[in-house]
Amino acid sequence: MAYQTPYFVIDENQLTKDFQMLKSSLETSWGNYRIGYSFKTNSLPWLVTFLKAGGVMAEVVSDDEYSLAGALGFSDSEIVYNGPVKKRPSFERVLLAGGILNMDGRRELDWMEELAAAHPTQTFRVGIRVNFDLEKMCPGQTTMGEA
């Protein structure tokens, strides 16, 4: 039998078992947690919808993924918006709706400052991505120094 590519084979029973094991481990170890599923990894609507039913948030990195998350039933407050190429309208929409946004770069800090000034009573849910030279801080303990 010939299949078109890409071709995904998903064992629903194993996926359910693994997902429940992850949730159980997080409940035991962390208590207060949320799982975000990366649309970039595999945005197959069946898979995303299956995981949404288990309570995951949508983790998106583009306007297309953001739109897909909405089309699959994720509210803005169930979206984590990552990545360095966000557009300002979706940046503001996610934050104003109570979603989580991880900021990348000075431009987004400027947008955040302007948005906060325009909505002084609103609380925003943000993360800040920080990059640093891990090999310099931990010499010989990373793969960065390997040829």
Predicted feature locations:
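Active-site loop/helix belt of alpha/beta enzymes
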Residues: 115, 132-147
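A charged N-terminal "starter" segment
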Residues: 1-117, 121-125
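ATP-grasp fold ATP-binding core
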Residues: 125-131
